[in-house]
A protein has these predicted regions:
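Glycine-rich phosphate-binding P-loop
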Residues: 4-19
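A short acidic, often aromatic-flanked loop/helix-cap motif at beta-alpha or helix-coil junctions
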Residues: 57-60, 182-188
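Switch II (G3) loop of P-loop NTPases
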Residues: 80-104
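N-terminal phosphate/diphosphate-binding loop that engages ATP/GTP or pyrophosphate donors
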Residues: 16-74, 78, 82-89
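Fold-independent oxyanion-binding glycine-rich loops
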Residues: 7-9, 30-32, 54-55, 94-96, ...
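Generic beta-sheet signal
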Residues: 1-5, 26, 89-93, 119
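Conserved catalytic-core segment of NTP-binding enzymes
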Residues: 20-22, 96-174, 178-179
Length: 192
């Protein structure tokens, strides 16, 4: 099974959700890493998964922009999909930023389309998440892709009223599969 993990934005907890979906029998693929972070190392440390980062660009910008500023070609959705298609077993593919962030000649949504893979949307807990999440899920469905559901990637230790209400309201957009405590990656089971 292949699952693409995308988000409503950057910094929403995609890497922690990816780690929560992985174990030592899973392969994790970071399509493109930008800036100094090492999401694959985080996933490997938290889950024991085999990890691959397909492209790394120096500046924390969109993959396409960071690659251009570095004077190199950006990895494309076709290159990402070709790599993933050679892998066996459960594969978790994490994008960069949100669903429609550019990877050369396309987006992580195009990767999901090429692979025929469903997506999980990682969202924030607080105020503003309903609109961002609805737009992301609508874009997924508009492309004829499957959204398995939503995970709140960084549930606060002391949630405010907006976060508590959003947890219920997000269910009207897509199933809420879970909420991860800030900075943690407890195992997350996805219904088959």
């Amino acid at each position: 099974m292949r699952i693409v993990v995308t988000g409503t934005d950057t910094g929403v907890g995609k890497t922690y959700v990816s780690a929560a979906l992985c174990d030592e029998r899973t392969t994790y693929v970071k399509a493109a890493q930008t800036g100094d972070d090492d999401d694959a190392a985080t996933v490997r440390e938290l889950s024991g998964a085999t990890t691959h980062t397909l492209a790394h660009y120096p500046e924390p910008l969109s993959p396409e922009r960071s690659a251009a500023r570095a004077g190199v070609a950006c990895i494309t959705p076709r290159e990402i999909a070709d790599f993933v298609e050679r892998l066996d077993g459960r594969v978790i593919i994490e994008g960069a930023g949100g669903l429609l962030v550019n990877f050369g000649a396309g987006t992580i949504a195009d990767v999901a389309q090429l692979l025929g893979a469903p997506l999980i949307v990682v969202a924030r807990a607080g105020l503003g998440t309903l609109n961002h999440t609805a737009l992301t899920v609508e874009a997924i469905r508009h492309r004829g892709l499957e959204c398995l559901g939503i995970v709140i990637g960084s549930w606060p230790a002391d949630p405010d009223l907006a976060a508590l209400c959003n947890l219920d309201d997000l269910q009207s957009i897509a199933p809420v599969l879970g909420k991860l405590p800030e900075g943690q990656a407890p195992k997350l089971e996805i219904p088959a």
